[in-house]
Amino acid sequence: METIPKLMAAVVLLTVCLEGCSSQHWSYGLRPGGKRNTEHLVDSFQEMGKEEDQMAEPQNFECTVHWPRSPLRDLRGALERLIEEEAGQKKM
């Protein structure tokens, strides 16, 4: 009976270790693949601060895609008007 809990604990521990070892390395500044160089550590933090300043500025986005008018939208509008007319006639 004692071997099963030990075996389960070993499997869980092995899984956690393998997951941690196979994960991707992220360097300073959250950019993948870079080397950690202590000489340039201050530069990377300053760059992160500049990126935050740029993110703080509001950005205006415009939709450049023009979708053709959908026939289903026209049908929906016609059905809504028909329902409103019928409801108006029933009230009278």
UniProtKB/Swiss-Prot annotation:
<feature type="site" description="Cleavage; by ACE">
    <location>
        <begin position="28"/>
        <end position="29"/>
    </location>
</feature>
<dbReference type="GO" id="GO:0034695">
    <property type="term" value="P:response to prostaglandin E"/>
</dbReference>
<dbReference type="GO" id="GO:0043066">
    <property type="term" value="P:negative regulation of apoptotic process"/>
</dbReference>
<dbReference type="GO" id="GO:0005798">
    <property type="term" value="C:Golgi-associated vesicle"/>
</dbReference>
<keyword id="KW-0873">Pyrrolidone carboxylic acid</keyword>
<dbReference type="GO" id="GO:0048545">
    <property type="term" value="P:response to steroid hormone"/>
</dbReference>
<feature type="site" description="Cleavage; by ACE">
    <location>
        <begin position="33"/>
        <end position="34"/>
    </location>
</feature>
<dbReference type="GO" id="GO:0033574">
    <property type="term" value="P:response to testosterone"/>
</dbReference>
<keyword id="KW-0372">Hormone</keyword>
<dbReference type="InterPro" id="IPR002012">
    <property type="entry name" value="GnRH"/>
</dbReference>
<dbReference type="GO" id="GO:1990008">
    <property type="term" value="C:neurosecretory vesicle"/>
</dbReference>
<dbReference type="GO" id="GO:0045471">
    <property type="term" value="P:response to ethanol"/>
</dbReference>
<keyword id="KW-0027">Amidation</keyword>
<dbReference type="GO" id="GO:0010468">
    <property type="term" value="P:regulation of gene expression"/>
</dbReference>
<dbReference type="GO" id="GO:2000354">
    <property type="term" value="P:regulation of ovarian follicle development"/>
</dbReference>
<dbReference type="GO" id="GO:0005615">
    <property type="term" value="C:extracellular space"/>
</dbReference>
<feature type="site" description="Cleavage; by ACE">
    <location>
        <begin position="26"/>
        <end position="27"/>
    </location>
</feature>
<dbReference type="GO" id="GO:0030425">
    <property type="term" value="C:dendrite"/>
</dbReference>
<dbReference type="GO" id="GO:0007565">
    <property type="term" value="P:female pregnancy"/>
</dbReference>
<dbReference type="GO" id="GO:0030238">
    <property type="term" value="P:male sex determination"/>
</dbReference>
<dbReference type="GO" id="GO:0005183">
    <property type="term" value="F:gonadotropin hormone-releasing hormone activity"/>
</dbReference>
<comment type="function">
    <text>Stimulates the secretion of gonadotropins; it stimulates the secretion of both luteinizing and follicle-stimulating hormones.</text>
</comment>
<dbReference type="GO" id="GO:0031530">
    <property type="term" value="F:gonadotropin-releasing hormone receptor binding"/>
</dbReference>
<feature type="modified residue" description="Glycine amide">
    <location>
        <position position="33"/>
    </location>
</feature>
<dbReference type="GO" id="GO:0043434">
    <property type="term" value="P:response to peptide hormone"/>
</dbReference>
<dbReference type="GO" id="GO:0098556">
    <property type="term" value="C:cytoplasmic side of rough endoplasmic reticulum membrane"/>
</dbReference>
<dbReference type="GO" id="GO:0023051">
    <property type="term" value="P:regulation of signaling"/>
</dbReference>
<feature type="signal peptide">
    <location>
        <begin position="1"/>
        <end position="23"/>
    </location>
</feature>
<keyword id="KW-0964">Secreted</keyword>
<dbReference type="InterPro" id="IPR004079">
    <property type="entry name" value="Gonadoliberin_I_precursor"/>
</dbReference>
<dbReference type="Pfam" id="PF00446">
    <property type="entry name" value="GnRH"/>
</dbReference>
<dbReference type="GO" id="GO:0042698">
    <property type="term" value="P:ovulation cycle"/>
</dbReference>
<feature type="site" description="Cleavage; by ACE">
    <location>
        <begin position="30"/>
        <end position="31"/>
    </location>
</feature>
<dbReference type="GO" id="GO:0033087">
    <property type="term" value="P:negative regulation of immature T cell proliferation"/>
</dbReference>
<protein>
    <recommendedName>
        <fullName>Progonadoliberin-1</fullName>
    </recommendedName>
</protein>
<comment type="similarity">
    <text>Belongs to the GnRH family.</text>
</comment>
<dbReference type="GO" id="GO:2001223">
    <property type="term" value="P:negative regulation of neuron migration"/>
</dbReference>
<keyword id="KW-0732">Signal</keyword>
<dbReference type="GO" id="GO:0044849">
    <property type="term" value="P:estrous cycle"/>
</dbReference>
<dbReference type="GO" id="GO:0035864">
    <property type="term" value="P:response to potassium ion"/>
</dbReference>
<dbReference type="InterPro" id="IPR019792">
    <property type="entry name" value="Gonadoliberin"/>
</dbReference>
<dbReference type="GO" id="GO:0043679">
    <property type="term" value="C:axon terminus"/>
</dbReference>
